[in-house]
C-alpha cells in the first residue's frame, strides 16, 4: 500500500514523499491516520535531526515519519493481534510510548509509523 508522509532526513530536512509501505508481518497492524497534532516536540526533532535524543543517527539513510500525537482507523491486523483488534476499529497512539531502556518512539524513530502520514505500519 502506498502512503504519503512527511519524513525527516536530518537537521531542517523534511520531505513530503509518497512511497510503498512493506507488507505487514504477523505482529504488525496497518492503519489509516485520521488526525495528527503538531507540537513543539516535532518542531524540535525537525530542527535537531540526528542530534535529537529520539531520532536515530542513521536518519539520512533511513528517514523517519514525523508526528507523535495521532489517531486513526485500523485497516489490516496481523494474525498475532486478530483476537484483540479488528479492521475498522479506532486507535490513538500514546505520544511518549517507548520500550524500557530505549528512547525510540513513534513520530521520532521509525520509518513506517508517525502521525504525518496517510497510512502507517504499527510495529509490535
Question: What role is predicted for each listed range?
Answer:
Residues 7-13:
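Extracellular beta-rich ligand/substrate-recognition surface
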Residues 104-118:
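Short, compositionally biased
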